A protein has these predicted regions:
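Basic helix-turn-helix/winged-helix DNA-binding cores
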Residues: 1-97
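Amphipathic alpha-helical dimerization/coiled-coil segments
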Residues: 84-133
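Charged, low-complexity intrinsically disordered regulatory/assembly segments
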Residues: 139-213
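A structural signal for alpha-helical segments
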Residues: 40, 67-70, 116, 144-155
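Non-transmembrane amphipathic alpha-helical segments
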Residues: 121, 128-139, 160, 167
């Protein structure tokens, strides 16, 4: 996974649960199957958190939870600004053959206000349409290209059409108030055995420990 996308994923996952310890982040990301769609090596998650701390985008708090030492992470203002910038770029950059940045941004869409999500979807749709127009212009001179190259171009156009349909539908859903975005009351409840319940209790305890200094 590219460094920028790793930063986006780790910053976003910390923002969801902060304060949160490294084991919890690792477990949560693996429950998202990031090792498959994002090609994240589970062992790299801890080093990624350390790297972001060194960049000043995360703050590490070394606490004693009961009798157990634990390191928990929160995002800094620098980290939140970096997340917002990278999220917007990932949403608006169209690369049909390498959509990982876009997919990463979608996984973290609930961390973004509704108006900003709507703007990013509109910008991506405009960028996609511009790319299709360029591709159509290039196809006008492909009559002498090998057949398999023209077949590849047909595949790209098909991918673009499928994504365009999805973008239009999702844009309509966002404007209609659907989906759960930043600052809104969730419309779903996790299962009783969801680890998030334990993480929420840990979060409250970590906040108290941090406040004590």
């Amino acid at each position: 996974m590219a460094a920028t996308e790793t930063r986006l994923l780790l910053l976003g996952s910390v923002m969801i649960f902060e304060p949160v310890n490294g084991y919890q982040i690792r477990r949560e990301l693996l429950s998202w199957n990031v090792q498959e769609w994002a090609h994240v090596n589970p062992g790299s998650i801890y080093s990624g958190l350390a790297t972001l701390t060194g960049r000043g985008e995360l703050a590490r708090h070394d606490l004693v939870d009961g009798s157990r030492p634990v390191a928990v992470y929160t995002t800094t203002e620098t980290g939140r600004h970096a997340f917002a910038r990278m999220w917007r770029a990932a949403m608006e950059t169209v690369d049909l053959l390498s959509p990982l940045g876009f997919h990463t941004a979608l996984a973290l869409m609930a961390l973004v206000p509704r108006d900003e999500v709507a703007e990013a979807l509109s910008a991506r749709l405009a960028a996609l349409d511009a790319g299709v127009r360029r591709q159509l212009a290039e196809q006008g001179g492909m009559e002498h290209s090998p057949p398999h190259v023209r077949a590849m171009a047909d595949l790209w156009m098909g991918l673009a059409q499928t994504e365009r349909e999805w973008l239009v539908t999702t844009q309509q859903r966002v404007r209609a108030g659907e989906l759960d975005l930043l600052g809104e009351q969730p419309s779903w409840v996790p299962r009783d055995d969801d680890p998030g319940w334990v993480m929420a209790r840990d979060r409250a305890r970590y906040l108290e420990l941090i406040a004590r200094g």
